[in-house]
Amino acid sequence: MDLNRIIQALKGTIDPKLRIAAETELNQSYKIINFAPSLLRIIVSDHVEFPVRQAAAIYLKNMVTQYWPDREPPPGEVIFPFNIHENDRQQIRDNIVEGIIRSPDLVRVQLTMCLRVIIRHDFPGHWPAVVDKIDYYLQSPNSGSWLGSLLCLYQLVKTYEYKKAEEREPLLAAMQIFLPRIQQQILQLLPDASHYSVLLQKQILKIFYALVQYALPLQLVNHQTMTTWMEIFRTIIDRTVPPETLQIDEDDRPELVWWKCKKWALHIVARLFERYGSPGNVTKEYFEFSEFFLKTYAVGIQQVLLKILDQYRQKEYIAPRVLQQAFNYLNQGVVHAVTWKQMKPHIQNISEDVIFSVMCYKDEDEELWQEDPYEYIRMKFDIFEDYASPTTAAQTLLYTAAKKRKEVLPKMMAFCYQILTDPNFDPRKKDGALHVIGSLAEILLKKSLFKDQIELFLQNHVFPLLMSNLGYLRARSCWVLHAFSSLKFHNELNLRNAVELAKKSLIEDEEMPVKVEAALALQSLISNQAQAKEHMKPYVRFIMQELLHIVRETENDDVTNVIQKLICEYSQDVASIAVDTTQHLAEIFGKVLQSDEYEEIEDKTVMAMGILHTIDTILTVVEDHPEIIQQLENICLRIIDLVLQKHVIEFYEEILSLAYNLTCHTISPQMWQLLGILYEVFQQDCFEYFTDMMPLLHNYVTVDTNALLSNPKHLEVLFTMCRKVLCGEAGEDAECYAAKLLEVIILQCKGRGIDQCIPLFIQLVLERLTRGVKTSELRTMCLQVAIAALYYSPELLFHTLEQVQLPHNPGPVTSQFINQWMNDTDYFLGHHDRKMCIIGLSVLLELQNRPPAVDAVAAQILPSILFLFLGLKQVCATRQTVNRENHSKAEKVDIEENEEISSEEEEETSVSAQAMQSQIGRSEEEDDDDWDEEVLEETALEGFSTPLDLDNSVDEYQFFTQALLTVQNRDAAWYQLLVAPLSEDQKRKLQEVYTLAEHRRTLAAGQFHI
């Protein structure tokens, strides 16, 4: 390859004027052998301009991601799709580690992504040498190679981070070498606090975290090595951050490597404690380790964390994520006697001076509220922000301490009440007090000492603050109303005041963060309080209008959920405003989808999805109002059209759900047109969404079968889609759905003249069976299509089987089909599939002109049917049991649980918990039933009903016994062949089936007579 030519093309991609020509040049070259290795040479060359190297790195990353994995040609095609040539792959494997070591950061990040893909596909099979290569550079005396080699090792560990234990063997073998190596390396680096040294330490910590965060490899970490690691973590957490970092702006300090290193050390110890070191909360393989961890390390680490909290109390700077992880660790320590004993003397100071301080309104909150209230709302309601927030972690620690340790709650409540009752206290501290009390609402509402005082607390301290001139106090007061919305009010006036104040804040307050909190409070009060719901009934239209305004302005997903819940609460009232509401939501959705920044902001996707869910809820609520559905249809079709036009595939599932709800009772001409549009989209990019399309396609077949059959194009579209799925690479789950749709069509159209379709359906499923089928579900589903065809017309099926020519599978197809069916009868699960199989076998045994293949399996037919009836009996028994259990659960009265740990129990907690876990594990293993759970459960596909699933449909017991009686009366010799193989037990079971069939016949006749 001509390197200069590639360099010029890459340079052209940076220039808007040359970009199209440059991209065309690259797209014509990338398949040429040696192109990918040439990109790597450009990337590592110091003689090439940096932007070109960066462009080359991005191009190589995209190539490796797309073309490194081996790909097979589509069915029926012989040309293999493009893959990077093996010679090129080998060159890249030989040089990419060096490339990562030598490259600057912005290029290195692209190369490490390449490396992850390569390791995922090639290690250990094609590339065991990567271990030796990384190890070589880790041992190099040149420290300049250490960061790159550690990044390579990180990619190796990340590849296996979430894999099951049995799949991690290649990694664990490699870590036998690497773990001692990086431990030794970090020990050497610890005394050096320079930026590069701490950067290396941080990377080693990230490797360790990825290794242990999902499973702790006990074969790699014995007590001695773990003790060394824990001392390393303790040292890093405890050491002083260089004082010169205080010169950096506070907003930028968390990104400094010294704080990041501390964060990762804390992340590790918190994870180890939570997942492996907390007796009573670990799986049995970690029982011994958890006892050792708690006894050996937990208190020592906690001592350092208490010191960090004290530094924060003394107003020293602590990075937010460090504080958060410290809270997470202490949260685990609260429940164990040994750690609680150390924590107990400090818990009041921690609660009042640290946790409380973190939970108060701060300068940065005020700044954001004033400068960008919409961003303030986004931050407060972002679950990802919550995950990393010290405020959330502090809240959790306080909640656990108050719940588990009896001395914590009364002292903290007294502290908060003192603040709330003193008019001279800083308003921000009042916010903190309300925040604390609201966070403990669930506990307070269960404690008789406190729950009777809550109503008075709301009346005296919350209602007045809803009228405060400070927006953040009004918002917090709404939040507290939300927290206590399930309170049993003794004075109806207080409840009315609460709901009125929430409504007033929603409709009249001028500050958007207050409106959002008021919306959540109002919805929660309405959902929890019947009187509140009734009281707000006259205002539903105004409330909905205001909520729509808020959603339009803030694009907040939580408010979208409020609308959704209120629609459910006021379903009758909402019907009258459903069209206006949906029209508003559709306008907001269109605005969001067509905004310039849509693709860049994930929140917009979440919010747009929330709108679609809300419209879906409206459709469900008004399903009994066809005149409203008709008006909503046009609005929804515009939304569907917009999503399909813009190919926003992340919303395909939601718009298909809308279309499904629009076709549940009738199907308009416009909805039939949508079928054709969906078919075109399906051909382009909806291939993997077939399972999401299935409920809608099922409606097209079952809701208006006359319209389906009135236009041959409709059936052709459905068959073509099924064929594409069954002949493509959609995966066996989707293929099961395609086969199910074919079965539904056959059963729905029995006796309605689709004879010309049956051979096409049969050929398709039998050809699929000749290719490799991994799951029994797909195999039985394909067989079921043929069984449905047998029920539709035995003559047509066997004529088709005689005519079918299957590729790579010579020989009579009829006998292959019958034999496969007989071999697989025990794989038919759920009610419908077993019923279909019984009906099919009944048709088979009753045939007068039987193919020889049926005679050959005579001995298997009745035993198979009896086995299927036994399965049906189990399904029915399980359903009855589940119904009884659900009924009994519903009748249980909630009992207040006292979850505090008494001092006498403390020392025994971990031992008894483990003993109980061990006993539970044993009893579960010993209580194995002969029947797998999956045999008892309905299959997912059974939700797609057929005429056989209706209450007044063919009864399988009567169908079978009638068929067998017919044979007995008409063909005694054949009857003897069928019953001769039966054992005495099977004959008894056959008689039970006869008895049950007669009982069902009598019941049906009685119902008919009534």
From Swiss-Prot:
Q: What happens when the gene is disrupted?
A: Knockout animals present with reduced grip strength and diminished vertical activity. Progressive dilatation can be observed in the aortic root at the level of the sinuses of Valsalva and distal ascending aorta, and aneurysms of the distal ascending aorta are becoming visible at the age of 8-12 weeks. Generally, males are more severely affected, exhibiting larger aortas and experiencing dissection and/or rupture more frequently than females.
Gene3D superfamilies per record: Leucine-rich Repeat Variant
Please give the residue ranges the record annotates as the region Disordered: 886-932
Which GO molecular function entries does the Swiss-Prot or TrEMBL record give? ATPase-coupled transmembrane transporter activity; small GTPase binding
Q: Which UniProt keywords apply?
A: Cytoplasm, Nucleus, Phosphoprotein, Protein transport, Transport
- Kindly list the positions at which Phosphoserine occurs in this protein: S902, S903
Q: Where in the cell is it found?
A: Cytoplasm; Nucleus
Q: Which residues form the Importin N-terminal domain?
A: 22-102
Q: What is its main location?
A: cytoplasm
For the keyword Membrane, the answer is no
Q: Where is the composition biased (Polar residues)?
A: 910-921
Q: Which domain of life is it from?
A: Eukaryota
What's one GO BP annotation on this UniProt entry?
A: nucleocytoplasmic transport
**SMART domains from the UniProt entry:** IBN_N
Self-association state and partner proteins as the record states: Forms a heterodimer with KPNB1. Interacts with SRP19. Interacts with RPL23A. Binds directly to nuclear pore complexes. Interacts with LRPPRC; the interaction occurs when LRPPRC is in its RNA-free form and promotes import of LRPPRC to the nucleus to allow for EIF4E-mediated export of mRNAS from the nucleus to the cytoplasm.
PANTHER family reported for this sequence: IMPORTIN-7, 8, 11, IMPORTIN-8
Q: Which family does it belong to?
A: Belongs to the importin beta family.
Q: State its role.
A: Involved in nuclear protein import, either by acting as autonomous nuclear transport receptor or as an adapter-like protein in association with the importin-beta subunit KPNB1. Acting autonomously, may serve as receptor for nuclear localization signals (NLS) and promote translocation of import substrates through the nuclear pore complex (NPC) by an energy requiring, Ran-dependent mechanism. At the nucleoplasmic side of the NPC, Ran binds to importin, the importin/substrate complex dissociates and importin is re-exported from the nucleus to the cytoplasm where GTP hydrolysis releases Ran.
Question: What is the protein named?
Answer: Importin-8
Gene source species:
Mus musculus
